[in-house]
């Protein structure tokens, strides 16, 4: 297998096309890229660049707030709010022995679910309202607009993924109804040059769910591990998102798609800002390899799991806020 030493670029402009030949080309690119490196830059995604710029502005404004102000909306049991530095550790990492917390802080929101939402009425894990800082004008509106736009884009991408996996797009979409979705506004302080190797902005890990769409600034620091175990830089490219697949999609695809390890090391000497959006299965989904992905040459590799319980375990392991909650 040839070594991949750069992140490929995929043009998804055809995702809105009815032209079968154009969709077929995109499907083939998805199959190849996410069966090998598992990361790509997306171009022609049709997300307004002004919306992305406004999102980063609101992120900057949030992280400039006094610590005491941000702590008014500290991360709660619904996994929403402010995550202070030194409170998140990738203890379950399969790719490094992680003992130190990530050197980042963030704001996180999820799908808004009020009292009359069916998920809240059923008592679904993490269902509930978001926490919002009241000090920043337009914060909620900007984040909600971006969140909604990214949700719609991921729904379209899921249709292409279903075709790539040989399964029915409508049936596959039902596994995300409604989806579990997260938007994080991350700030990574610069790590001094003499910092020990076990200190990361974000320790080596794979993502939990299905699709991650990352908007990042020009600072750099994101690295992706290729099949040979080498770390590849993923620098900023204007008007792109970096898309990677997570553990649930690797399971659904029976290993045909890879959930690739990645990390952040911010030795730039300046702050790094990034805004990842996570699109994951419905919290009650049962995730097991699709029949279309099980063959004589690719026998079943994974058992069925409950996504919500898997996510609960990961959050309890990785976040101080959840590790102090009742795990029974």
Language-model segments: which ranges?
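Peripheral, non-catalytic segments flanking oxidoreductase cores
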Residues: 1-328
């Amino acid at each position: 297998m040839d070594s991949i030493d750069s992140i490929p670029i995929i043009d998804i402009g055809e995702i809105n096309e009815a032209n079968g030949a154009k969709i077929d080309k995109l499907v083939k690119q998805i199959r190849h890229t996410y069966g090998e490196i598992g990361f790509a830059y997306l171009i022609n995604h049709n997300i307004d660049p002004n919306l992305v710029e406004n999102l980063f502005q609101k992120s900057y404004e949030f992280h400039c707030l006094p610590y005491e102000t941000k702590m008014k909306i500290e991360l709660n049991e619904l996994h929403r709010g402010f995550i202070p530095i030194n409170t998140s550790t990738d203890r379950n990492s399969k790719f490094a022995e992680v003992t130190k917390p990530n050197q980042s802080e963030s704001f996180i929101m999820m799908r808004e679910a009020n009292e009359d939402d069916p998920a809240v009425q059923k008592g679904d894990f993490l269902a509930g309202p978001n926490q919002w800082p009241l000090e920043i004008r337009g914060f909620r509106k900007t984040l909600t607009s971006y969140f909604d736009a990214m949700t719609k884009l991921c729904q379209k991408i899921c249709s292409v993924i279903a075709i790539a996996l040989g399964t029915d797009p409508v049936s596959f979409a039902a596994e995300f109804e409604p989806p579990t979705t997260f938007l994080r506004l991350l700030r990574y302080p610069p790590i001094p040059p003499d910092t020990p190797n076990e200190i990361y902005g974000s320790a080596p890990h794979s993502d939990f769910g299905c699709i991650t769409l990352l908007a990042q600034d020009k600072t750099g620091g994101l690295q992706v591990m290729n099949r040979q175990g080498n770390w590849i830089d993923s620098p900023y490219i204007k008007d792109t998102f970096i898309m990677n697949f997570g553990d649930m999609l690797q399971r659904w695809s029976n290993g045909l798609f890879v959930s690739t390890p990645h990390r952040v090391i911010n030795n730039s000497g300046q702050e790094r800002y990034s805004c990842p959006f996570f699109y994951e299965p419905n919290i009650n989904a049962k995730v097991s390899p699709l029949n279309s992905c099980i063959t004589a040459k690719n026998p079943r590799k994974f058992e069925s799991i409950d996504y919500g319980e898997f996510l609960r375990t990961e959050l309890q392991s990785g976040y101080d806020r959840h590790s102090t909650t009742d795990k029974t």
